[in-house]
Amino acid sequence: MNVYPRFFIVLYKLKMIRSFRGIAPNIAVSAYVDPSAVVIGDVTVGAHSSVWPNVTARGDTGPIRIGAETSIQDNSVLHLDEGIPLTIGDRVTVGHSVVLHGCTIEDDCLIGIGAIILNGARIGKGAVVAAGSLVAENAEVPAATLVMGVPAKPKRPVTPEEQARFAEGVKHYVEKAAVYKAEAQQAEASQAAAEKAEASQAVAEKAEAR
């Protein structure tokens, strides 16, 4: 059973997070979903993950699974075809304006800005897809490998220094998302308090009028 804090209930009211054919998104309490993001249907967002402005995650033909401490950055699109799930592991960074369609992204990967990854492709653990690259259908990207180009091809191993830098990036987004979430919840609490005070005042004024 899904349990959502008030913040997510507000997003439901705005219809940005909504069910499809009776299946509602399952969003971890510690995750952050920006109010402008659209999350539909069979979508799971793991603990301390973040979904940023204008992202669309549309789980209307199958499951979209986003692991823990993963960031889906601004304007990215997540979708799939029937029978081809979309799975994103833990500690994955998905850059701005990325398209992920029915693919598998293993843990600790970095997907560069504007990359496109198509049905059946698998990105191995710790791999990097360079900005603007196209990973073709059913392609296999080896673990800890940098690929780039159209179509994307292996260029070299990911260095330990790069891996450490990417891990810092993951930590940065987890911390930033927590700040965004706290501010959103504070704003919502302030609005709720103001609405309650306004309602109480209306009741008092009505009583005086009698």
Q: Model-predicted segments: where are they?
A:
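Glycine-rich hexapeptide-repeat left-handed beta-helix
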Residues: K13-I27, Y32, D60-A68, D74-S76, ...
